[in-house]
Amino acid sequence: MGEKAVPLLRRRRVKRSCPSCGSELGVEEKRGKGNPISIQLFPPELVEHIISFLPVRDLVALGQTCRYFHEVCDGEGVWRRICRRLSPRLQDQGSGVRPWKRAAILNYTKGLYFQAFGGRRRCLSKSVAPLLAHGYRRFLPTKDHVFILDYVGTLFFLKNALVSTLGQMQWKRACRYVVLCRGAKDFASDPRCDTVYRKYLYVLATREPQEVVGTTSSRACDCVEVYLQSSGQRVFKMTFHHSMTFKQIVLVGQETQRALLLLTEEGKIYSLVVNETQLDQPRSYTVQLALRKVSHYLPHLRVACMTSNQSSTLYVTDQGGVYFEVHTPGVYRDLFGTLQAFDPLDQQMPLALSLPAKILFCALGYNHLGLVDEFGRIFMQGNNRYGQLGTGDKMDRGEPTQVCYLQRPITLWCGLNHSLVLSQSSEFSKELLGCGCGAGGRLPGWPKGSASFVKLQVKVPLCACALCATRECLYILSSHDIEQHAPYRHLPASRVVGTPEPSLGARAPQDPGGMAQACEEYLSQIHSCQTLQDRTEKMKEIVGWMPLMAAQKDFFWEALDMLQRAEGGGGGVGPPAPET
């Protein structure tokens, strides 16, 4: 009976018509035998049920055929069924305008790819995908393993292990996973590019307090938990007051004086110092949480995000301003080309960078950095010994310099002596570009390196959104969030290349960075000083904070030094005597 039923079904022709595009699509169907069956006769629930079995790629393609299928394929009911199929254990669809569609696409596009620099295989491999993960938000490779944080705060521990493939034992990266902890907000480790130094993992999480007899109410508190990266064992925990909520954590400094920088929801920076060499000892001690100087001396600033290295920290405000902390003279000279404003006794004093537009995100290497503004322009600064700035030469830059031939990057990464940029080459493809030192295979296809950004021989996934490189491997994170739109704006015609920048006076009425409020704060700080000597020193600090060009800062510092020396010598500096 089954063999006869198949030909009978094939004789009936289904009429694929669109209600909004007309009832007739052609004359060919009229010539067919039998009465055609229109898709309009199917109930909407049946149509949604049928197309919910399609792969996500085919469902998106079907929704682009006509208006009717676009409305059907865009329904939340279809995406709810797909999301249940992709992530059966997902209980909550999350938040947003389109929660089920967002959740389904997050879980469909999630993936972590890696390519080893050494060896014969020069292709991307995919790590194990945790079934419990709700998309991938960020990741961090350590010495032995990889840690991934999803969109519901679950931190996964992807282990390297020996596996048997075709009867042969092979060492594979990120092939097994376990859940490290839940309720995580952010995590960090040693900021150096070499993963050998990443012994501990610091996790910023929210925990419900333990029930105490005699209390009726309990509030969730933020805490920092420290884990061994090798085994995932928790060795230390510090809990904060429930009134303080944080959203980001970064590390800076050496192991014996490791500084933890914590960013609050209000945009303030707090710091505390721990000794990593004593974390594995079974004892408890108290650490002091203090307000960082960037938030103490500049209270009007609201920090949006921060990034760090072993001896420097970069802050980006909500208005797009950038402030720098440099803690060693060598790195300061590489970044700014001078030691004029470096104070070894006050290393936390922030310095403002002079930038033409609002900065969206940045990347910080050991002695160079990259900035991306709201128009998609890339600015590089710092040491350029290996051509890691991508300017086409090997001359150091003491102030942000635009890389004119590269715009609108997806993400930017700066390493020890090379830089990587993930760019959208076309609508359906992405490419990875790099510059700097190519030793050890860190620039695939360019073993001798390059002083300009060149296309690397890496097959980039379609939904790649983040990248990271270690000494042994290149990692690419794949994820797509439909609620994250393109952040870039079109550059005004008056500010295209070849047109002079508008003067400070022309932009003063807009005051995008709150400069007027900042100047009032500076004046109040100078007024609070008691002596002329203290006021001169405070003015030097303020010059370092203000977004001035390097030559302008040197001029003001030299002029203030002249006035200070004249004051110390007992003689005043006045106008020259008139000629007779």
Curated annotation (Swiss-Prot):
Keywords: Ubl conjugation pathway. One of its GO terms (cellular component) is SCF ubiquitin ligase complex. RCC repeats lie at residues 376-425. Pfam families: F-box-like (PF12937), RCC1 (PF00415). One of its GO terms (molecular function) is ubiquitin-protein transferase activity. Residues 36-82 form the F-box domain. Gene3D superfamilies: 1.20.1280.50, Regulator of chromosome condensation 1/beta-lactamase-inhibitor protein II. SMART domains: FBOX. Signal peptide: none annotated. InterPro entries: F-box-like_dom_sf (IPR036047), F-box_dom (IPR001810), F-box_protein_24 (IPR052866), RCC1/BLIP-II (IPR009091), Reg_chr_condens (IPR000408). GO terms for biological process: axoneme assembly; chromatin organization; mitochondrion organization; mRNA splicing, via spliceosome; piRNA processing; protein catabolic process; protein ubiquitination; single fertilization. Substrate-recognition component of the SCF (SKP1-CUL1-F-box protein)-type E3 ubiquitin ligase complex. Directly interacts with SKP1 and CUL1. This is F-box only protein 24. It comes from Homo sapiens (Human). The lineage of its organism: Eukaryota, Metazoa, Chordata, Craniata, Vertebrata.
